[in-house]
Amino acid sequence: MSMSVDTTIEGETGTEISADEARVIDVVERLIADHDPGSTPERAFLEAQYDAGLAWVHFPEGEGGLGVSPKLQRTVLQRIGSAGGPMGGMKNPIGYGMCGPAVQVHGTPAQKELLRPLFSNEQIWCQLFSEPGAGSDVASLATRAELDGDEWIVNGQKVWTTLAQFASYGLLIARTDPELPKHRGITAFIVDMHAPGVDTRPLRQMTGEAEFNEVYFTDVRIPDTMRVDEEGRGWAVSITTLMNERVS
């Protein structure tokens, strides 16, 4: 993804700010002027924020961003927060911080259309990587996906999945070629969490709350159009996702 070449200009207080920051501030001010945070419904405001390129400012224009440094997202949050606006991603932290960036890098144009409802909290996302027998070695997964025509049939189990019980979609990795070395035989998919065969079971804590879940897949059919990147590129998708966990 390309970013603009930045220069510095003088800000309102006489201090120097970058041209990119000045641009971001201008876009934020126009967003707030056109969509009063005090009267605009939260989802409508967040959709307008996405359309303005202020969802993930480092994403390309037209995909929720402006093509500027990700550090400028702080400027967006501060100014929208000061105006009483909603904080995009707060209700959807896994989707916003990890799944969205992975789909932006590896997804198809059709898959990237899911970023807008993800950001507006219309659709919650979860990450389906960890398995009971794999421990911290994500690549040692046993969940299988087998191609059947233009669909993949998935069987297996994931665990410690945050917010899966509320999710519309999940970013799933599964083994598609058991003959290859473990890091190479993995493929990533976007799975409909309400598809037949998906069984989400909350893991109750002593407090009665259930932030984490087990998710079982029994002959779940995923269209090949929901495969993320090429077959066998699931580990690359995983690395992108987990690197964003470090900064989300």
Listing of model-derived features with the role each one plays in the protein:
Residues 1-94, 104, 113-117:
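Amphipathic, small/basic residue-rich leader segments at the start of a protein or domain
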Residues 93, 133-136, 160-163, 178-180, ...:
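Short Gly/Pro-enriched turn/cap motifs at secondary-structure boundaries
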Residues 155-201:
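A short core secondary-structure module
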